[in-house]
Design a protein with these regions (language model features):
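Hydrophobic faces of well-ordered beta-strands that scaffold small-molecule active sites
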Residues: 5-7, 34-39, 73-75, 111-113, ...
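Acidic-and-aromatic substrate-binding clefts and catalytic sites of carbohydrate-active enzymes
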Residues: 8-22, 42-49, 80-84, 119-128, ...
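Active-site acidic/histidine proton-transfer and metal-coordination neighborhood
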Residues: 28-30, 48-147, 157, 168, ...
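Catalytic-core regions built around general acid/base machinery
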Residues: 19-30, 99-104, 165, 219-223
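Catalytic domains of carbohydrate-active enzymes, especially glycoside hydrolases
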Residues: 1-10, 68-69
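Conserved, mostly hydrophobic/aromatic
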Residues: 5, 27, 54, 65, ...
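N-terminal small/glycine-rich loop or linker at the start of catalytic domains
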Residues: 35-45, 80, 193-201
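Histidine-acidic metal/acid-base catalytic patches
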Residues: 1, 131-263
Length: 263
């Protein structure tokens, strides 16, 4: 039993704009909404014309989100290309986000920055994968239509503590990806060796049932409750079948009731 669906801008059917309102109607007929859009702009390319094209794509995704009835649209920093300095990357990404914000406001959309691992179609890992870089970028963009989509599992993939990250950014978290990850084989260090040179996620990486992995959801929800979080929590699970997804939903429902009894 869920309340909504997070949408993915890359669904093949979304290439036809006439489908957008149809999908919204179908979802709403089931008593649900589409609050969040998942998309992956690449704002760190050194070529200004490339970045301008990514801004244009992001604006289309913002309009897509609005048409579907959503209020949150993801942004990423971009790829961590060789030779790109932290200062350059932060500047490129912040500038692109700022150029998207007026249109986001016009459409009633909040842009949500995620500390990601690596988009499926990227060669290089996320530029702002590391906590210090992510926080530098976050500090550069201050706007009421901009916040954080917190995914605790991505911190593990950067060799970092998701709670340490949360304590630094909790006041700016507006949405969350609830997930649990595990390595099918090897170690985090083995994973890092595979970050560059292979498009998409390393094969040793897998999603797990929520509540069964490394994430401490009691600590996470305690902090989010403390800072007044009241946003959407999107479930990242289901790759191993609907039964596992149902167990993840049940786990999160119980935790939400525990920490937000008013819901």
């Amino acid at each position: 039993d869920i309340d909504g669906l997070e949408w993915y801008a890359g669904f093949i059917e979304m290439q036809d704009e006439s489908n957008w309102k149809k999908f919204r109607k179908q979802v709403e007929m089931h008593g649900k909404t589409i609050p969040m859009m998942c998309c992956s702009p690449d704002f760190t390319h050194p070529d200004p014309s490339f970045r301008l094209n990514e801004i244009t794509k992001q604006k289309k995704w913002i309009f897509m989100t609005s048409t579907l009835g959503g209020t949150y649209c993801r942004v990423l920093s971009g790829q961590r290309r060789p030779g790109l300095s932290v200062e350059e990357g932060v500047s490129f990404a912040a500038d692109c986000i700022y150029k998207c914000l007026p249109y986001a406001k016009e459409q009633g959309i909040t842009l949500i920055l995620e500390k990601h691992y690596k988009d499926d179609f990227w060669v290089y890992p996320e530029f702002a994968q590391k906590m210090d870089v992510f926080c530098k970028l976050l500090d550069k963009v201050n706007d009421e239509h901009f916040g954080v989509n917190y995914d605790p599992s991505n911190a593990f993939l950067a060799g970092e503590d998701p709670l340490e990250l949360l304590y630094k950014i909790s006041a700016r978290v507006v949405t969350m990806h609830a997930s649990d990850r595990y390595l099918k084989e090897g170690t985090i260090e083995d994973l890092r060796k595979e970050e560059v040179g292979a498009t998409g996620y390393a094969k040793r990486l897998a999603h797990g049932e929520i509540g069964k992995g490394l994430n401490n959801y009691d600590a996470i929800f305690t902090e989010l409750k403390k800072v007044g979080f009241n946003g959407w929590i999107s479930i990242e699970d289901g790759v191993d079948g609907l039964e596992q997804l149902e167990r993840s939903v049940s786990f999160l429902r119980k935790k939400i009731k525990q920490y937000w009894p008013e819901h």
